[in-house]
Design a protein with these regions (language model features):
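Short glycine-enriched nucleophile-adjacent loop
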Residues: 167-178
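Bacterial N-terminal signal peptides
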Residues: 7-18
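N-terminal cap/lid segment of alpha/beta-hydrolase-fold proteins
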Residues: 35-75
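Loop/turn elements at helix/coil->beta-strand transitions in domains of secreted/extracellular proteins
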Residues: 63-65, 77-81, 112-115, 154-157, ...
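Alpha/beta-hydrolase fold nucleophile elbow
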Residues: 153-165
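Cap/lid segment of the alpha/beta-hydrolase catalytic domain
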Residues: 73-149, 198-199
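Boundary at the C-terminal end of the N-terminal hydrophobic targeting segment
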Residues: 22-26
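Accessory cap/linker subdomain of secreted extracellular hydrolases
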Residues: 27, 40, 102, 111, ...
Length: 282
């Protein structure tokens, strides 16, 4: 077996042990026991890792993506990277409950000698730009991997892991042949990756020519151009402070989708329920 294959298998085996539960959407309120466990995990992580939060990583068009980095304190050797890039909320501080969120994945990675890097997709939370599921995910993913490979603490080997939307962009970026893209674990990427006219598609929007209603409901909560944004000159320290005080997750009113999805034309469904204008307005 080739050395590169062995390295990839070892990377995948190690990353599989890191359950990326931090990026799942929140359920019920955490118990006191769970909050205590979160605090203990965060304290241990702080003792083992160099932590850089709200690093604004530049993309080729000048927009910057908000990124948190956790890497081993031992600087004697360069380390491989586990990379999670997501449209969902990974803020290190649970503003509602006044405690750290679950940082188990980050801690597990650092203990195994990996850096753990998580980035919000453009147009989400502290990242700049406007979210476009049909355009920027591929170029942003490739740019992020190249940026990480060039960091002085990196061994230029980046592996990705993630579920659903966080899985689908991996497949498209892998096809570009970035030499630093060493391994990938796309979990639950059932939506698929294809093309819609000139655009690469990050989701199976059409089946037999019919729009899939699942993605209309998903976009209702994910593609919101009307959101709070910080000035480009906001310091890293101020962004970190803001992330402890404000939860930028939108609180979308509930929708009876069994009725809403019967609206015609389909392109106006989100508008009809008071949602963001989204891609159908373009």
């Amino acid at each position: 077996m080739k050395t590169t294959q062995i390295v990839t298998i070892l990377f995948v085996a190690g990353a599989l042990a890191m359950v990326p539960g931090a990026h799942a959407q929140p359920g019920g309120a955490p118990t006191q026991q769970q909050l205590a466990a979160r605090n203990a995990t965060a304290k241990e992580l702080e003792s083992l890792a160099v932590i850089e939060r709200k690093v604004m990583v530049p993309m080729r068009d000048g927009k910057r993506m908000a990124t948190d980095i956790y890497r081993p304190r031992d600087a004697s050797k360069k380390v491989p990277i586990v990379f999670v890039r997501t449209p969902y909320n990974f803020n290190f501080w649970d503003v509602k409950n006044g405690a750290p969120r679950d940082l188990t994945s980050e801690l597990d990675a650092v203990k195994r000698g990996y850096a753990y890097v998580e980035m919000n997709e453009r147009g989400h939370f502290f990242s700049e730009g406007e979210y476009d599921i049909l355009g920027s995910p591929l170029t942003d993913g490739a740019d992020a991997i190249s940026w990480m490979a060039a960091q002085p603490w990196s061994n230029s080997k980046v592996g990705t892991i993630g579920c659903s939307s966080t899985a689908e962009w991996q497949l498209g970026v892998a096809a570009q042949g970035n030499p630093a893209f060493a391994a990938m674990i796309p979990q639950g990427f059932g939506a698929g990756v294809g093309r819609v006219k000139p655009y690469y598609e990050q989701g199976n929007w059409y089946r037999g020519g019919a729009v899939q209603m699942l993605f209309i409901a998903w976009l209702y909560g994910e593609q919101n151009q009307v959101r709070p944004m910080f000035p480009p000159n906001t310091s890293q320290a101020d962004l970190i402070q803001a992330s402890r005080l404000f939860d930028l997750a939108p609180q979308m009113p509930p929708v009876d989708w069994s009725k809403a999805l019967q609206h015609l034309p389909e392109m106006d469904i989100i508008k009809a329920v008071g949602g963001p204008r989204g891609i159908f307005a373009d």
